[in-house]
């Protein structure tokens, strides 16, 4: 697959198989139950059968840390949801979807961060969780690190 997008995180063509915990999307298992990943998009979800991969690996929830409309110019066209995918596509397949609008390269309040940590903790009681922002690095890593510090202290 050739990446015709401005951002290397929009396609798997920039990554080796060892850099993708799930086939076809930049992703890494941080713990046995928490997957960090780049944002998915509708064509990719279909072509790599992402929902099927979620079911096969036990992922029951997806946490989206993007703001609607974010990074509209570097990847596939945004859906009416304001994201590169329709969250309903996951929910109709019994995968919970949570969205916390957190500005890229921005900060968030301690209250908001604690709310996100609590939701991540709750979601983990249902099964494995995939967390993404745009690239699956900054906000995704901060949330997962905060969860690990808070719950594994």
What are these regions (language model features)?
Residues 13-128, 151-152:
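Cysteine-based protein phosphatase catalytic domain of the PTP/DSP
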Residues 1-12:
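Eukaryotic intrinsically disordered, low-complexity, charge-rich
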């Amino acid at each position: 697959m050739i990446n015709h997008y401005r951002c290397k995180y929009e396609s798997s063509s920039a990554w080796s198989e060892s850099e993708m915990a799930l086939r076809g999307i930049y992703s890494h298992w941080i713990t046995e139950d928490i997957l960090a990943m780049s944002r998915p998009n509708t064509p990719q979800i279909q072509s790599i059968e992402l929902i099927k991969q979620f079911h096969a690996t036990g992922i029951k929830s997806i946490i989206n840390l993007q703001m609607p409309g974010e990074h509209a110019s570097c990847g596939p066209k945004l859906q009416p949801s304001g994201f590169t995918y329709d969250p309903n596509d996951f929910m109709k397949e019994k995968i919970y979807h949570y969205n916390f609008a957190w500005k890229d390269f921005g900060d968030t309040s301690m209250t908001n961060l604690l709310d996100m940590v609590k939701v991540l903790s709750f979601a983990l009681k249902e099964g494995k969780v995939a967390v993404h922002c745009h690239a699956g690095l900054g906000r995704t890593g901060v949330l997962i690190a905060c969860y690990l510090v808070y719950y594994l202290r």
